[in-house]
Amino acid sequence: MSKYSEYKIVLVGLGPHAKRIYINLFKKYKINLGLLIDLQSQKEKIKEYLNKHNFTETELFLIDDSYKDLTSLPYSISDDLQKVIKLKNIKYAIISTEPKAHFMYAKFFLENDVNILLDKPITAPICCNSDINQARKIKEEYNELCKLYESKKNKINFMIQCQRRFHEGFIFVENILKEIIQKYNIPITYIDIYHSDGMCAMPSEYLTRENHPYKYGYGKLFHSGYHFIDLLT
């Protein structure tokens, strides 16, 4: 038995990132994936994937696709999810959904005293690149989560997953910037970022793509491009 098997974890979202990072870690360290939350439309694909990778004991909690763009879980769903989490004694959550759903799940787990590892960015309101009120929600949702966590942080941890802080390339760039600033005593006044993540989105994908999408009113800056902003801060 693994020393990590006592950690019962709920994973929210089984997308490409979760499969590449988290599932491999669960397998490597024999971590107990007690519960997986995803959309009803993904049921058969998820069951097939879990069986293929020997996660036969993992329970599924599926949510109707019509709720995927909400900012809070409907009471009937949150009540059922609370019961499942308590029954399975789950104390740790990894949120790896599309960013527009981050706030909904982060708020739920904070309210239920569950430790959280949240993929970056913290939140991504729909159409925040074209609607000023939606853009303001980035700060509003951040403040709301901070306030919630402030009242809970003696009991639980809430961490943001930003793994490229430890990437050799990013560390190299960061060190060069620090060296120049210190040596010449000059600030950084302008940054030009060009980033494509090694892929090209076809025109049709702007309307259909669900992984690293553009159709929800945010794009690369809220996905892989986020790491450059994180580096600068």
Language model feature labels by segment:
Residues 120:
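Short basic (Lys/Arg) and small-residue
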Residues 23, 82, 147-153, 204-210:
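Short amphipathic alpha-helical segments, especially helix-boundary/capping motifs
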Residues 15-16, 100-103, 107, 143, ...:
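A structural signal for well-ordered alpha-helical segments within the folded catalytic domains
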Residues 1-2, 182-183, 223:
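A general structural signal for short secondary-structure junctions and capping/turn motifs
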Residues 125-202, 218:
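A contiguous active-site-proximal alpha/beta segment in oxidoreductase catalytic domains
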Residues 1-112, 124-147:
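N-terminal glycine-/serine-/threonine-rich beta1-alpha1-beta2 phosphate-ribose binding loop
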Residues 162-168, 203-233:
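Mid-domain beta-loop-alpha active-site segment that forms a flexible
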